[in-house]
């Protein structure tokens, strides 16, 4: 006799029915194998409960302060970098700085006064300037414009 697909059967004991608990008074009935009373016999304990040990959410410190959603984060460019990128002087704005690879587009630019321009006259337009940067740019014969 040849074996065909409809002759195949699972091995005895390989497929057992799921135990349905809490149905009647037989085995796994009434208390459904949970014993009597106590927190384990009732629904469930919270995920934060660690068996009496001080839970992690109480061990860690509370975070102080808040996150200001109106905070403005500037991209910073120093004068020494401007002198490197624009040795011939001329107009310098956020678009030129993006093209030169000094900043990324989409965020405001602030010019800081680290280094010096080496006598290069620049007409710089940016969203913010430090006081020392303004002084050094005007001293070199350039001008500043806040956007």
Swiss-Prot record:
One of its GO terms (molecular function) is structural constituent of ribosome. Keywords: Ribonucleoprotein, Ribosomal protein, RNA-binding, rRNA-binding. One of its GO terms (biological process) is translation. One of its GO terms (cellular component) is cytosolic large ribosomal subunit. Belongs to the universal ribosomal protein uL15 family. Binds to the 23S rRNA. This is Large ribosomal subunit protein uL15. It comes from Salinispora arenicola (strain CNS-205). The gene is rplO.
């Amino acid at each position: 006799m040849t074996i065909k697909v409809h002759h195949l059967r699972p091995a005895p004991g390989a497929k057992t029915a799921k135990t349905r608990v809490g149905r009647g008074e037989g085995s796994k009935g009434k208390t459904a194998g949970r014993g009597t009373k106590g927190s384990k016999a009732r629904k469930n304990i919270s995920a934060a409960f660690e068996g009496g040990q001080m839970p992690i959410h109480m061990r860690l410190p509370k975070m102080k302060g808040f996150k200001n959603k109106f905070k403005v984060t500037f991209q910073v460019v120093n004068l020494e970098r401007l002198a490197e990128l624009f040795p011939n002087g001329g107009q310098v704005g956020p678009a030129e700085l993006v093209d030169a690879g000094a900043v990324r587009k989409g965020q405001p630019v602030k010019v800081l006064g680290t280094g010096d321009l080496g006598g290069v006259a620049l007409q710089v337009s940016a969203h913010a300037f430090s006081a020392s940067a303004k002084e050094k740019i005007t001293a070199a014969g350039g001008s500043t414009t806040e956007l």
